[in-house]
A protein has these predicted regions:
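Active-site neighborhood of divalent metal-dependent phosphoester/pyrophosphate hydrolases
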Residues: 61-62
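Conserved, mostly hydrophobic/aromatic
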Residues: 12, 16, 58, 93
Length: 146
């Protein structure tokens, strides 16, 4: 099964020592018209390879910073463009979960995402929100979110 790490956006609200995200002044997010082309390619592949599935892992930056409309549109394209192949599209998401809310959860659930990958580091200074790596602020947000 091909697995695609789909970097929906370069934007991220965290500042973690181990991350390879480059914090740009103007981070890019995939345009919705290009997202449509991606789903057309997914469908073409799945039609050509009827025994295959595609796993798509929404990643980033922070995937939630791409905005809820991106995922609503992806869900729409899954239903419309991939109508006959959608059962072989498997989605996952890797997030720092600090921006997760019920709207994201509802859309992700409809996409078949039932587990959200994240990492948690209790060691101070490894992870933080904003430019300063303040783990206390991050951990507070992390636990309030859930």
């Amino acid at each position: 099964m091909p697995t695609i790490i789909f970097k929906a956006t370069e934007a991220c609200n965290a500042n973690c020592v181990y991350c390879d995200v480059v914090h740009r002044k103007k981070p890019r997010t995939i345009p919705l018209d290009l997202l449509k082309v991606v789903f057309e390619r997914f469908n073409e592949y799945l039609l050509e390879c009827p025994n295959e599935e595609i796993r798509v892992i929404w990643h980033g930056g922070e995937p939630c910073m791409a905005g809820i409309e991106l995922y609503k549109t992806a869900l729409k394209y899954t239903k419309e463009i991939c109508e006959g192949t959608k059962d072989r599209l498997k989605f996952a998401v890797q997030s720092n979960i600090t921006m997760m809310n019920q709207e994201f959860l509802d859309v992700f659930m409809e996409m078949g995402i039932h587990v959200i990958g994240t990492s948690y580091e209790p060691i101070h200074g490894v992870r933080g929100l904003g430019k300063v790596r303040d783990s206390r602020l991050y951990n507070k947000k992390f636990f309030i979110t859930w």
